Design a protein with these regions (language model features):
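Short intrinsically disordered terminal tails
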Residues: 1-8, 104-108
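Short coil-to-beta transition motif at edge beta-strands of beta-rich domains
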Residues: 3-22
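Short, solvent-exposed coil/turn segments at beta-strand boundaries
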Residues: 8, 33-36
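Surface loops and adjacent helix of pleckstrin homology
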Residues: 17, 44, 85
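Short solvent-exposed loop/turn micro-motifs enriched in small/polar/acidic residues
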Residues: 22-24, 53
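Short beta-strand-centered aromatic/proline hotspots
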Residues: 25-34
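SH3/SH3-like beta-barrel fold
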Residues: 39-43
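Intrinsically disordered, low-complexity, charged/polar segments
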Residues: 47-108
Length: 108
């Protein structure tokens, strides 16, 4: 298991279990804050496109491994902290985040 440090402002993919109908490619988003043992991850909702935040463990897995850890999730109950891979082919460009953030700031 690779143990790399997260960078604030960098895009990653969070892999969840259960996936709630989302693909195993993970949810693309950006780390907005680092806590002692976790990071705050911001992502766009697939329903409506508004920004949401989740707090996940500071655990980065190599992108080559992709989605894994379902058995561990079931055993530990930590279904929302399976792992995070670096987003190398992110579908939402950073400008999309800026656009949504701008709308939130202006109250739209």
């Amino acid at each position: 298991m690779e143990n790399k440090e997260f960078e604030v402002g960098k895009f990653y993919r969070v892999h969840l279990y259960p996936t709630y109908g989302m693909s195993d490619k993970g949810i693309p988003g950006m780390v907005v804050r680092k806590l002692k043992k976790k990071v705050v991850f911001e992502y766009l909702s697939c329903f409506g496109g508004e920004l949401h935040k989740m707090t996940v463990e500071r655990r980065l897995i190599p992108a080559s491994e992709g989605f894994h850890g379902v058995e561990e999730a079931v055993a530990t109950g930590k279904w929302n902290s399976i792992g995070i891979t670096e987003a190398t082919d992110i579908c939402d460009k950073p400008s999309r985040w800026d656009l949504v953030r701008g709308n939130e700031a202006s109250g739209n």
